[in-house]
Amino acid sequence: MAPAADMTSLPLGVKVEDPPFGKPAGGGGGQTPSTTAATAAAMGADAEGAKPKVSPSLLPFSVEALMADHRKPGAKKSVLAASEGAQAAGGSAKPLGARPGSLAAPDAPSSPRPLGHFSVGGLLKLPEDALVKAESPEKPERTPWMQNPRFSPPPSRRLSPPACTLRKHKTNRKPRTPFTTAQLLALERKFRQKQYLSIAERAEFSSSLSLTETQVKIWFQNRRAKAKRLQEAELEKLKMAAKPMLPPATFGLSFPLGGPAAVAAPAGASLYGASGPFQRAALPVAPVGLYTAHVGYSMYHLT
């Protein structure tokens, strides 16, 4: 009888829990809670056995992988090994967050992503003939928007060197008369004697020099114009020499200022005259002139 009492005490020691949806423990069609838990465990084991077993792996860009890199020194190698194992188990499956083709298996065929012409991969993938063509001095290919005349620069215009503009002579101009030395000396001697010749004198003088009257007349006209230019230049030189280097009010006086009245003015007299309100200031001037006079003038004393 003692064993029976022990057997009846075992079920009483099991803790009975309510089901998750509020059903009573004893309302399961006559099944006990222990049999229900055993059945669920068996079904879960069958489902897990049907699925392929995949080792838990960390994604290379997940938070756990990044945190593991800082915590453990060898975590990076384990993460890479786990990612390779996941790729081998999943076949063509790619890790989330990774760029296509970056971490794929080398023997797994994958469609390459089209690369731009200016990216590093595009430059490395370009064939040699394309590189040679780009470096060739031929005209480069332009995109349609560059071919638009609004955006394309204007064609460079070659500027021709400016032509030397020469003075155009008259078509019916007579050639210049080549005078000899004897003729030039005779013409100069005659010009010093008389600048204007009469018709008879010109005819006689031209016949003596074996020249025409027109040649003698033109030579005298040119010689008179030259003499006039020389005379004007000489007068300009004389004017420049007569002008003082500095203003005359500072260094010289061309006429005496202040007569006897200015000399006899008292020392305490006002500088402004009393004749009117608009009278200019009259400074007393000494009777002796300044010693620095104009150029060409000698020193003098006022008496």
Swiss-Prot record:
Keywords: Developmental protein, DNA-binding, Homeobox, Isopeptide bond, Nucleus, Repressor, Transcription, Transcription regulation, Ubl conjugation. Sumoylated by PIAS1, desumoylated by SENP1. Sumoylation of Lys-15 and Lys-133 not required for interaction with H1-5, transcriptional repression, inhibition of myoblast differentiation, or binding to gene promoters. InterPro entries: HD, HD_metazoa, Homeobox_CS, Homeodomain-like_sf, Msh_Homeobox_Regulators. GO terms for biological process: embryonic morphogenesis; inner ear development; negative regulation of gene expression; negative regulation of odontoblast differentiation; nose development; positive regulation of cell cycle; positive regulation of odontogenesis; regulation of odontogenesis. There is a cross-link at residues 15, 133 (Glycyl lysine isopeptide (Lys-Gly) (interchain with G-Cter in SUMO)). Its main location: nucleus. GO terms for molecular function: DNA-binding transcription factor activity, RNA polymerase II-specific; RNA polymerase II transcription regulatory region sequence-specific DNA binding; transcription cis-regulatory region binding. Residues 172-231 bind DNA. CDD domains: homeodomain (cd00086). The keyword DNA-binding applies. Belongs to the Msh homeobox family. Acts as a transcriptional repressor. Capable of transcription autoinactivation. Binds to the consensus sequence 5'-C/GTAAT-3' in downstream activin regulatory elements (DARE) in the gene promoter, thereby repressing the transcription of CGA/alpha-GSU and GNRHR. Represses transcription of myoblast differentiation factors. Binds to core enhancer regions in target gene promoters of myoblast differentiation factors with binding specificity facilitated by interaction with PIAS1. This is Homeobox protein MSX-1.
